[in-house]
A protein has these predicted regions:
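Short secondary-structure transition/capping segments
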Residues: 194, 237-239
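Helix-loop module immediately N-terminal to the HCX5R catalytic loop
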Residues: 178-201
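Cytosolic regulatory regions built on CNB/CRP/Popeye-like sensor folds
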Residues: 1-173, 187-188, 209-232, 239
Length: 239
């Protein structure tokens, strides 16, 4: 069962499937993040109940760039590396290393797009995974905050910043004043350069990529929002 303790943190006990204390380390890491404090205990209970356990070998490709999204993953044992193939680097540009308690696979599920990177196990290990529909119901909806343009502008006036997650070529064609450009596939690599005290409003053309970016930031404890309708839906573009 998952409950709140007196300090405002989650306590975990008697999760279906059991396991050793060491085996639950990944669960503890997840529940200690600020983002998971926004998720109702009932959602978390259902989330852990519906997750499937998967064993992996070193060198195994869990997610391949260009494939359709089907699952959200959390590492429960071992480590993985995130790479992205580019025209200039066919072997893959290293974007991040992931360890126990860290997750991946969110972007394609939220944006309904293709996988934008490849995830390969660096060691033997284990994962838990959650199907797309369960992910959207239990995790995506509680963590994703949409804002209309008037509200977004109010937040900007109070110190929030636009985070444009389109490609640099799109950004150069047109962008909002003072917007910061961090393409979606670079979010994991660049997240440490962002100010954790600054609210960010993610934007893209339609809202698909920016919703994935806002979710990733929320997972990491940022105060993140996504512009409803994207730039196109709000007629924000070159004159």
């Amino acid at each position: 069962m998952i409950t709140w303790d007196q300090t405002g943190s989650y306590e975990v006990s008697e999760i279906a499937g059991g396991g050793s204390a060491d085996g639950d380390d990944w669960m503890t890491v997840l529940l200690q993040t600020k983002a998971f404090h926004r998720i109702p205990p009932a959602n978390l209970q259902a989330l852990f109940m519906r997750m499937q356990h998967v064993a992996c070998r070193a060198g195994e490709v869990v997610i391949k760039q260009g494939d359709d999204g089907d699952f959200f993953y959390v590492i429960t044992k071992g480590a993985a590396v995130v790479t992205r193939e580019t025209p200039m680097n066919r072997d893959g540009l290293k974007l991040a290393e992931l360890g126990v308690g860290e997750s991946f696979g969110e972007e394609a599920l939220i944006s309904d797009g293709k996988r934008n990177a490849t995830i390969t196990m660096q060691t033997d290990g284990a994962l838990v995974r959650l199907g797309k529909d369960d992910f959207k119901e239990l995790l995506n909806e509680p963590l994703l905050h949409w804002v209309e343009l008037p509200r977004a502008r109010e937040l900007i006036e109070r110190g929030a910043k636009w985070l444009d997650v389109r490609l640099p070529s799109e950004f150069e064609t047109f962008h909002l004043d003072d917007a910061l450009n961090v393409p979606l596939y670079f979010i994991r690599l660049k997240v440490k350069t962002l100010d954790t005290k600054t609210p960010y409003i993610a934007v893209c053309d339609t809202g698909r990529r920016s919703s994935a970016a806002a979710f990733l930031l929320s997972e990491r404890g940022f105060d993140a929002y996504c512009l409803q309708g994207g730039m196109a839906g709000n007629q924000l573009g070159p004159d």
